Design a protein with these regions (language model features):
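Fe(II)/2-oxoglutarate oxygenase catalytic core
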Residues: 1-135, 139-183
Length: 183
């Protein structure tokens, strides 16, 4: 499901952008490796809340009881990003929320796809604008991607994982985050 303006109170938009961690490289960065401002911490708290978990459980007919949640941030998109993929089998649910005040680009808009071969064969295109939220159940055919875009592109990704996948997921993200400091 998707919500075009999940952040109904526009008065927080500016503080979210100002409080968003400075990320000038591509890739996902775990929340615990970043310095988050107050409004972003508050938003992450809401996204990780029991209330949000219950909404996702009802919507997707899954139990998230005792399932770990991992939150990552993206601040910069590279030309190589956006390739068609389905999420890792370690994930149960993926939630993405975009925090870009303005988006005047035709590229960089997430597309939920009908197949793994054609970026133009999509079910829905998600705006990359402030408060656009999309959530989906991870399946082997939950194909998504976007037309290549390079530049600032702010988003928060929340994933509910299978219990035995947390250490593997954390290791991969921490190693990747560490290596990005050098490349």
């Amino acid at each position: 499901f998707s919500v075009k303006d999940a952040l109904s109170s526009k008065k927080y938009h500016t503080s979210l952008v100002l409080d968003f961690p400075s990320i000038n490289k591509g890739g996902s960065f775990p929340s615990d490796s970043l310095s988050l401002g107050q409004s972003v911490q508050r938003l992450v708290g809401e996204l990780e809340s029991k209330k949000m978990k219950e909404i996702l459980e009802r919507k997707f007919q899954v139990s998230l009881k005792n399932k770990p949640v991992v939150t990552t941030f993206r601040g910069h998109s590279r030309m190589k990003d956006g390739k068609i993929h389905s999420d890792s089998k370690t994930k149960i649910i993926t939630v993405l929320i975009y925090l870009n005040v303005h988006w005047n680009h035709k590229n960089g808009l997430l597309r939920l796809l009908k197949d793994k071969k054609n970026l133009d064969n999509y079910i829905q295109e998600i705006p990359a604008t402030m408060g656009s939220l999309v959530a989906f159940k991870v399946t082997e055919n939950c194909w998504h991607g976007f037309q290549s875009y390079e530049g600032k592109r702010l988003s928060i990704q929340l994933n509910y994982l299978y219990e035995n996948a947390l250490s593997q997921h954390n290791f991969r993200h921490k190693l990747s985050s560490f290596l990005k400091k050098f490349f």
